[in-house]
C-alpha cells in the first residue's frame, strides 16, 4: 500500500524536470531566496491586502556572483478585470496611461482619484512582470529578435531557502556568497550594517526608518515597517555591486509607490475630500520632498535651483498632481524609476562628453514625459549654476523601466525598443555582455513552495486560523491548478494539549499516481506553542493546449 505522506509522483524525474507549462520559482527566485530576506521578498511580490502594502513600483534587487550580476526589476501589469469594471462604471475616468494608446509618459501619471480605484488597479488579479537583467562577462552572442521567443524553464532542484531574521547573518551563510574570493566582501557588508553609525545617520536611512524600534541592535530597523525590509535589502546588494565592480556612486534612491509614514511634508493645498485623498497627498508630497533632498546639494550655488524645483513641485501639487489636462505639470516620471547619483572626480564621471550626453538624454526624457518649458529651463539652470565640473550630484546614469500601455507580447515594439537601448547602455558602461529577460508571472498562488512559506509566516504571527488561511488560498489559485491539499500538524491552539493534524482539500487531489503532475513542498514554523508543520500538494491539470503559467521572452 502506498504511503500517503510521501507522494510517489514527487520523486519521479519528470515532475522535477523543466516544463514550459508549469510555474517554477527556481528560475528567478532561488538566488533571491538564498541571498535576500525571504519575508521581504515574498511581501514584495504578493498581491496587496488591507493589512499589507502589497506590490511596490520600482522594486529592484541586485545579486552579484563570481562571473555575472543579476538585477531583478519587479513591475506590475494591468489586471484583466479592469476591462469589465470600466464597462460597468461609465462615470469613471478612462483616459489612463495603461489603457490610452499613444500616451506620452507611461510613468507620467501614477495618481488614482480614489482609494477604490487604486485597489482596482493593484488588485489581487494584477499580473506581475519581472525584468531580470543579467550582466555576464562571458563571450556569449545574444541575437536581437523582433518577435519574442519562449524559452524552457530550469527544473526543480533545491527547494530549501535560508530564512534568517538577521540580514547580515543571512549574507554570511548564504550559499551563493560562500566563494572564498568574496568572503571578505560579504563580511564587510555585514560589518557596515551592524557597526557603521554614519550609514544609519544618512537622510536615505532616516527616510526609510523614521522611527527607531524599541528593540536594541542595528538590525532591529527591519521590523519597523513592512516596506522597510526590501528597501534595506536593495541598499545592501547595491553596496555589494559597488564594491566588486568599482562603480563609485552614492546609495541608489528607489522611490516606491508607498513610503514610510511620518516623512510627508506639510500640505500645500486645502482640505481633501476624504481620508484616502489626504493619505495619497501625503505619500506624493513625501516622495517629492525626498526627491528634492536627494537630487540637490547644500551648496549655495544650487540653492536657487533647489528653491525653483520646490516651487515647481508645489505648483504641480496645487494643479492636481499629474493630471491629464494641459495646465498640469506631471513630475511622476521620477517616481517608479531608479536613479544613480555619482560623484565628481571618481571613476567614469571624469568623462565630460559622456556626462553631457547623459544630460541630453535626460532632457529628451523630460520633454517626452513632461513636455513643459519650465522643466527644460530647470535642467539648464542646474548646468549653468555649478558647471559640469563643480556639480556634487548629477544624474549620470539613469536606468528607467518604461511601463507601457500593453504587456508582452502585445505592444512589443515600444517595449523592446526601450529594453534594447537599456541593454546597449549597460553593456557600454560595464564592458560586459548584457542579457535582458522578461518573465511574465500570472499568479503567485500556484507553487507549493511559496504557499507553504506564506502559511508558515501566518502561523508564526498568529494572524488567522487554519480554515481561514485555506479559504483565502482557494480563492487565489488559478484555473490551471486542478486541486490542492494542505495539512497542518502540531499544537495549533493554546487549548490543545496534544498535537493534532488537520487536512483540507479542494477539488481533485491525488498523491500517489504515477502519471500525475504534482508539486509538493513542506515547511516548519516555530510558534509559541511548539513546532508546527505544513505540507502542500498541488495537482496540475493534464489538459493540453492550456496557457503557460509563466513565460519567458527572449529579447
From Swiss-Prot:
It is found in: Mitochondrion. Residues 1-20 are annotated as: Disordered. Coiled coil: none annotated. It comes from the Eukaryota. One of its GO terms (cellular component) is ribosome. GO terms for molecular function: RNA binding; structural constituent of ribosome. Pfam families: Ribosomal_S3_C. GO terms for biological process: translation. InterPro entries: KH_sf_prok-type, Ribosomal_S3_C_sf, Ribosomal_uS3_C, Ribosomal_uS3m_plant. Keywords: Mitochondrion, Ribonucleoprotein, Ribosomal protein. Signal peptide: none annotated. The keyword Ribosomal protein applies. Belongs to the universal ribosomal protein uS3 family. This is Small ribosomal subunit protein uS3m. It comes from Brassica napus.
